[in-house]
Amino acid sequence: GHSGIDINKGRLNADTLMGRLLSGLNSEFRIVTLCGGFKDNVIPNACECVIATNGEISNCLAEFAKNNITDGDKGLKITAEKAEKADKCLNDKSTADVVKFLLGFKSGVMAMSQSMPGLVESSQNLGVANISGGYFNAVMSVRSSVKPEKQRLLDGIRSLAVQYGAELNIHGDYPAWEYRENSRLRDKMTEVYGKMYGKKPTVETVHAGLECGLLGEKIAGFDAVSLGPDMWDIHTANEHLSVSSAGRVYEFLRNVLKEL
């Protein structure tokens, strides 16, 4: 799912779930490979880990599934199969560090808005966790509508990097698009919508990054409204939108422009 819009829906993160699973194994093991998630702003729905062990893990997996899968997670599948013998694997310390990181990283809602009930203020998502070239890589997305809170989350990740002797790279930073209590553009669009459809539109705030935030930082007095067609299951393999609603958005936008 979308790491912003869907972050408060309680969906499991496959990467952090793998950490919980590995920490519960009662046999000694070393990690050979790890591959979970593909993008920082997507809640990962799959994670695969190859381990080297002399122990039997089937019973542990069954017990883990019994204790961790709820009625809301019926689509979750945990499978194990024998892999080919590996030539290389992580040492004991590196294996333990990877498991501790996956187990300890808080992925999800970090704070709710105090001014807008039900709106997520701050969140972080572990979108990618993999081992490549002998190195463990983790890619996260950090969001907040409050700049100091976003910095606090980044400082926490920076502290983790120091703790594990890791290199930290920050990229793709974008400013928050703060809600304007008084918006002439929003009022005009509400008026046009009412004329077209005979009812008021639903105006919502969302926990997601939008281009309006970037423009708002550069343009003094910037007033903006984001609109689009009906969409479902964003950032999933089942992502889709209503074509008919796209047509309605087009006509609505044309009428708004005529009024400006």
Question: Which residue stretches match the model-derived regions?
Answer:
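A short, flexible beta-alpha/helix-coil linker loop
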Residues: 1-4, 175, 231-234
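Midchain, well-structured core segments that form catalytic/ion-binding scaffolds
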Residues: 1-143
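His/Asp/Glu-rich mid-to-C-terminal helical/loop segments that flank catalytic regions of hydrolases
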Residues: 9-27, 96-103, 111, 151-159, ...
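Structural signal for hydrophobic packing residues in well-ordered secondary-structure cores
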Residues: 22-29, 61-72, 106, 161-165, ...
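A structural micro-motif
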Residues: 29, 51, 76, 166, ...
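Short glycine/threonine-rich loop-to-helix capping motif typified by GTGT followed
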Residues: 41-48, 178-191, 214-218
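Zn-dependent metallopeptidase/amidohydrolase metal-coordination segment
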Residues: 114, 121-136, 141, 193, ...
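Substrate-recognition/cap regions that form aromatic- and gly/pro-loop-enriched pockets
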Residues: 119-208
